Regions:
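Membrane-interface helix-cap regions at the ends of transmembrane helices
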Residues: 60, 104-107, 165-170
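Juxtamembrane helix-loop-helix connectors linking adjacent transmembrane helices
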Residues: 29-41, 66-137, 144-145, 149
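N-terminal, membrane-interfacial amphipathic/helix-forming hydrophobic leader that caps
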Residues: 1-76
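Hydrophobic alpha-helical transmembrane segments
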Residues: 7-11, 15, 43-44, 81-88, ...
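Membrane-interface helix/loop boundary segments of multi-pass membrane proteins
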Residues: 134-159, 163-166
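Aromatic-anchored segments of alpha-helical transmembrane domains
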Residues: 17-23, 92-97, 161-170
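Hydrophobic transmembrane-helix microenvironments that flank and shape a buried ionizable site
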Residues: 6, 18, 43, 131-133, ...
Length: 170
């Protein structure tokens, strides 16, 4: 693999991230136009973003990078019950510990139930789950492994980390 191809593949993976996000947001916006509640649209956008990115990256890995998804750090997907339990209990334990450890008045946001649902659905489904899922596939999956194949593990760890930081500054 040439340096040019490794760099090109890395930027193509970031482009796939952007395109997946734009398509997901566009489709979710279309649902909003037909009066689907905003909170539901946020969940749709998150699911579409993660799903589209996976499908596009899988096609990219097979056709362009010519590596199986497992070689890019993305083996067959399987969810174990203990991780579902951990995903539910961990935030609850952190929040509970916080409430027990720190005193003070509870301040209400005065938001309606709909506003709370809209805010939480965007924060959890899109920003919390989908964005993290896609960013890991792109930066720690495709980019890290393509650069590791071309150079070495040190460069493969440092370069995606810098790119990741740069993308978040934008």
């Amino acid at each position: 693999m040439s340096t040019k191809k490794a760099i090109g593949d890395s930027f193509a993976a970031i482009f796939i991230l952007l395109i997946s996000q734009l398509i997901a947001q566009g489709i979710a916006t279309a649902f909003g136009l037909i009066k689907v509640p905003s909170g539901v649209c946020n969940i749709i956008a998150g699911a579409l973003y993660a799903g589209l990115a996976y499908v596009f990256l899988k096609a990219f890995a097979g056709k362009i990078v010519k590596l199986p998804m497992a070689d890019l750090g993305m083996p067959e997907f399987a969810v174990k019950k203990r991780w579902i339990l951990t995903a539910v209990l961990l935030p609850s334990l952190v929040k509970g510990s916080y409430l027990l450890a720190f005193s003070g008045p509870y301040v209400s946001s005065n938001m309606s139930g709909t506003q709370i649902f809209n805010t939480l659905s965007a924060g959890i489904a899109f920003t919390g789950i989908a964005a993290g899922f896609v960013e890991e596939m792109v930066f720690r999956g495709v980019i890290l492994n393509v650069l590791k194949k071309k150079w070495n593990i040190k460069a493969a760890v440092i370069v995606p980390s810098i790119l990741f930081g740069f993308v978040h500054i934008l």
